[in-house]
Amino acid sequence: METVRQAARRALEDRFEVLLAGEGGQGLILAGVILAEAAAVHGGLNAIQTQSYGPEARGGASRSEVIIAKGEIDYPEVMTADLLLCMSQEACDKFYPKVKDDGCIVVDSTNVSRVPSHRAITVPISHIAEEVTGRRITASMVALGFVGGLTGVVSKQALEKAVADRAPAGTEEMNLKALAAGFAEAERLRGDGNEPLCA
């Protein structure tokens, strides 16, 4: 069986599809933009980001789709995700069927109590954000760091540069701190070469 990182590297040869899903106000649209820019502007890869959200400013459904590839990207939306990030129960219930058989589901255990698959990796993302920055809104940056550290698809340096470029003025340091906490959680989980298996 492949580790998450091995599967991500293999998928990147064709296209690595990421679906970030949750509620409006969680910062997932910005997280998707940062992930795409980290890959394309700072990582030398091709990337496309699309987004969708409900009419509510906060609390409605929100998702950001990011396709990353070494070659050209011929279709701009996620068909079957290599990685699904669920930041709400509704997102988890709705989108887990869109994950590839050998794909990975990362769940914010702070907000999701019913995990639909034994393949899911549960992480208290929102709790970590509150602990590290005192702001729950930075959970999307914790999640981005965790996804980056888990998959290795985009380097930590590329993500840091994209966060510094895109974070709202005056919040760069806080967002970089949240990103670092996500990477640290991925490292803690991977431990001594004990990488998670999603398949």
Spell out what each predicted region is.
Residues M1-A199:
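Active-site cofactor/cluster-binding pocket
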